[in-house]
Amino acid sequence: MELPPGPRDDPHAWDDDSDPELEPDTDAQAEAYVARLLSPPKLGLAPPRAPPLPAPTVSFGSLEPRAASKGPTVAVPGLLSLPPELLLEICAYLDARLVLHVLPRVCHALRDLVRDRVTWRLRAQRRVRAPYPVVEEEDFDWPTACIELEQHLSRWADDGRRAEYFCLADGHFASIDSVLLLQGGTLCLSGSRDRNVNLWDLQQLGVEPSRVLVKTLGTQKNSTHKGWVWSLAALDHRVCSGSWDSTVKLWDMAADGQQFGEIKGKAAVLCLSYRPDILVTGTYDKKVTVYDPRVGPALLKSRRLHSSAVLALLADDRHIISGSEDHTLVVFDRRANSVLQRLQLDSYLLCMSYQEPQLWAGDNQGLLHVFANRSGCFQLVRSFDVGHRSQITGIKHSLGALYTTSTDKTIRVHVPTDPPRTICTRSHHNVLNGICAEGNLVVAASGGLSLEVWRLQA
């Protein structure tokens, strides 16, 4: 049955401000609401009406409903009544990810405590008990660093006994010199002196061993390249491989690893860096060459920046950084199109890992070097002996982890403190030529024709 329109249905009635009634006392209404709906009833007696109260001076927080009690109400101190120092001590026993992502949803007090950068700095330094990070930065991401540190320490606890180990020895018939993880560590590429680039599906580890090796890239009958494959680099699903045959080949992993481009140079390609707008090569003829991978790839410029072969290379939006056998580290300013710095070193760099502002590099004497990017100027700030007895061939640095490989036949796992603390060492029967870490996978390239794989706790 449809009711006839009433005064509340009149759209103009809500615009009338001439109501002579006094505005209600909202505090009194709240008190009455709590008393009426949330107080325990008494059997046989009608609840007496509370006399009108004067305007209270307490906040609405004091009027929140409380659990019914037969006796007089007693204030019981809660967790939030503890001093911040005790709350932090309790949080120290909780997983860092839970503290960062869950506790802020509980209440404002915990949110403010968790968002304090000092909270995470103290937590991280308590975990590592050493100067960290090696390069101080104003906007250092302490929460993320703390999560990575704790995860890294947990994964490699007890000398790495929790990590699953796999040896992939059936894909190449010569030394493997480069390795690259893709798609969060689910796929792996390896470049070898057998002139091939192999694609591996690491999701099949321990499930279907015969399906781990997916294919060899390329359409040539015998091999991917006509020379040793020495370097690999990737941008999203696009990959490039550099070879001693003086070519760089480009592959589309989203198209089943089909080749979509080739660069023919004049010297062996020893190192690569792949950016959205440039592809950079370091070659045996002492040159650093820049291509536009979006067109062609088209040659943009080539400079002889060194007096010996270019062995290590990386690039970001502002710089191209190259290390050479001539014992120099050259910083090229992309915007000014000129050399910004040329640093003379006592050794030559074989590998580099960069996460601004920290540049970590391994040299031919088994030492680690840390350079700091300070306002676009790179400075050598620290050098470390982490136990390697010969050349460091691979390095992977992140906020909370540090991995190195060497021709001394070891892979070493460190915490990136000052100095680095080695928490695990794995020995191999042959030299190790490089390393890559992504997600929960760590893969090392071996001169013994194999890929050495460690699957860590997720």
Curated annotation (Swiss-Prot):
Q: Which InterPro entries does its entry note?
A: F-box-like_dom_sf (IPR036047), F-box_dom (IPR001810), G-protein_beta_WD-40_rep (IPR020472), WD40/YVTN_repeat-like_dom_sf (IPR015943), WD40_repeat_CS (IPR019775), WD40_repeat_dom_sf (IPR036322), WD40_rpt (IPR001680)
UniProt cross-references to SMART domains, sorted A to Z: FBOX, WD40
Instruction: State the protein's purpose.
Output: Substrate-recognition component of the SCF (SKP1-CUL1-F-box protein)-type E3 ubiquitin ligase complex.
Q: Which domain of life does the protein's organism represent?
A: Eukaryota
Q: Where are the WD repeats?
A: 171-210, 224-261, 264-301, 305-342, 344-381, 387-424, 427-458
Which PROSITE patterns has this protein been placed in?
Answer: FBOX, WD_REPEATS_1, WD_REPEATS_2, WD_REPEATS_REGION
For the F-box domain, which residue ranges apply?
76-123
Q: How does it assemble?
A: Interacts with SKP1 and CUL1.
Q: Which UniProt keywords apply?
A: Acetylation, Phosphoprotein, Repeat, Ubl conjugation pathway, WD repeat
**Biased composition annotated in UniProt, kind: Acidic residues:** 16-28
Sequence segments annotated as region (Disordered) = 1-28
- List, alphabetically, the Pfam families matched: F-box-like (PF12937), WD40 (PF00400)
Q: What is this protein called?
A: F-box/WD repeat-containing protein 9
Record gene name: FBXW9
| Entry-annotated residues carrying N-acetylmethionine | M1
Q: Among its keywords, does the record have Repeat?
A: yes
Residues annotated as carrying Phosphoserine in the record are S18, S59
